[in-house]
């Protein structure tokens, strides 16, 4: 098996020549230049991804949901029982959760992956990549060893690349795990340098009178574990969780194939921050689906330099926002491939010349 360093070195650069050709093509379509706004920019971004061979298109779609428990749940940072992780993972196998319904609407397959659920036996119907029965309590110890983090990254990268070989061209990331907004906030605080109180939110409806404890837990975790903000693996291993590592692996795996990844909400932003520390080359492959309602969302997205396409006041997680945004990707591909051209209709708009239209 390749090492993580070897895999990171395989991530291709975006093709600027393909993007320039796409820009000229889009400017010559039956519309005023720029009138389809961010949809045009999205099509151009897709055209630059080597895995799509210069033509924006969508083949198979997949949302990969990483499921794991967190030792930090013991610190009272979540109101949901820890057992809900396993219950909801099982519900995902029945197709009844939010992400499953939205993914079905978008024509995407949901891959439910156990990377660290705290049950005695594996849950039937889940893809088993379990590292342990939940991560360590980051308030008193590292979430996991560096070796565990690297192995899980490699496993997920390889799984993602295999899906790409089988025709998946659009990936979405999601997660499931009680208390996981706490390690996500710790990652965001560590990498952005912002104080815990600026990035810690209520997660799954944590009462406001418990928020101070959650902020304190994040601060203690960072102080105790001393994650290196320049080392994405170190941050994930010390103050992250198996679900966050898994999402980072999907991003790295898809980017290594030159393919796009739709982010979800706050948890995925945290994973993206860590993944980009491992390989800044993945950033052009990341597409932000929606603006999470979680407190630190804007801070994380600003650090990533990303602007979401939707603002639906969602904070469910699971990959729900990624699934919801998949039709936007398909719309960008549709305008690129199916609209008529100005030149064919003998239309010359101000700012366009005949040579422009025929180039």
Swiss-Prot record:
Active site positions, chain numbering: 318
Family annotation (InterPro entries): Nict_dMeBzImd_PRibTrfase, Nict_dMeBzImd_PRibTrfase_bact, Nict_dMeBzImd_PRibTrfase_N, Nict_dMeBzImd_PRibTrfase_sf
Reaction(s) the record says it catalyses: 5,6-dimethylbenzimidazole + nicotinate beta-D-ribonucleotide = alpha-ribazole 5'-phosphate + nicotinate + H(+)
S-S bridge residues: none
Pathway membership: Nucleoside biosynthesis; alpha-ribazole biosynthesis; alpha-ribazole from 5,6-dimethylbenzimidazole: step 1/2
Molecular-function annotations in GO: nicotinate-nucleotide-dimethylbenzimidazole phosphoribosyltransferase activity
GO biological process: cobalamin biosynthetic process
Coiled-coil portions: none
EC number assigned by the record: 2.4.2.21
UniProt KW Transferase keyword: yes
Enzyme class: transferase
Keyword Glycosyltransferase attributed: yes
UniProt keywords, alphabetically: Cobalamin biosynthesis, Glycosyltransferase, Transferase
Domain of life where this protein originates: Bacteria
Primary role: Catalyzes the synthesis of alpha-ribazole-5'-phosphate from nicotinate mononucleotide (NAMN) and 5,6-dimethylbenzimidazole (DMB).
Family of the protein in this entry: Belongs to the CobT family.
HAMAP family given in the database record: CobT
Subunit structure: Homodimer.
Entry protein name: Nicotinate-nucleotide--dimethylbenzimidazole phosphoribosyltransferase
């Amino acid at each position: 098996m390749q090492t993580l360093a070897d895999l990171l070195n395989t991530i291709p650069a975006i093709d600027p020549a393909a993007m320039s050709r796409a820009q000229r093509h889009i400017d010559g379509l039956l519309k005023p230049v720029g009138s389809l706004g961010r949809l045009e920019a999205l099509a151009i971004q897709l055209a630059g991804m080597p895995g799509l061979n210069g033509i924006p298109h969508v083949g198979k779609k997949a949302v990969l949901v990483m499921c794991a428990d967190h030792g930090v749940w013991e610190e009272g940072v979540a109101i949901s029982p820890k057992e809900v992780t396993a219950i909801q993972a099982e519900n995902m196998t029945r197709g009844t959760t939010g992400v499953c319904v939205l993914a079905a609407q978008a024509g995407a397959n949901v891959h439910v992956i156990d990377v660290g659920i705290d049950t005695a036996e594996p849950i039937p119907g889940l893809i088993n990549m379990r590292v342990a029965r939940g991560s360590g309590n980051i308030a008193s110890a590292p979430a996991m060893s560096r070796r565990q983090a690297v192995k899980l990254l490699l496993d997920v990268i390889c799984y993602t690349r295999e899906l790409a070989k089988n025709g998946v061209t659009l990936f979405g990331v999601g997660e499931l795990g009680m208390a996981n907004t706490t390690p996500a906030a710790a990652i965001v605080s560590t990498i952005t340098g912002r104080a815990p109180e600026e990035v810690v939110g209520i997660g799954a409806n944590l009462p406001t009178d418990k928020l101070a404890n959650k902020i304190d837990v994040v601060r203690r975790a960072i102080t105790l574990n001393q994650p290196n903000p320049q080392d994405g693996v170190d941050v994930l291993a010390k103050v992250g969780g198996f679900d966050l590592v898994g999402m980072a692996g999907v991003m790295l795996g898809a980017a290594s194939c030159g393919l796009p990844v739709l982010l979800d909400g706050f948890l995925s932003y945290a994973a993206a921050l860590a993944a980009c520390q491992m390989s800044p080359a993945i950033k052009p492959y990341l597409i932000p689906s929606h603006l999470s309602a979680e407190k630190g969302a804007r801070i994380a997205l600003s650090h990533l330099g990303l602007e979401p396409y939707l603002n639906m006041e969602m904070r469910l997680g699971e990959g729900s926002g990624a699934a919801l945004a998949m039709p936007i990707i398909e719309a960008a591909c549709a305008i690129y491939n199916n609209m008529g051209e100005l030149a064919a209709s003998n239309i010359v708009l101000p700012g366009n010349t005949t040579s422009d239209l025929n180039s």
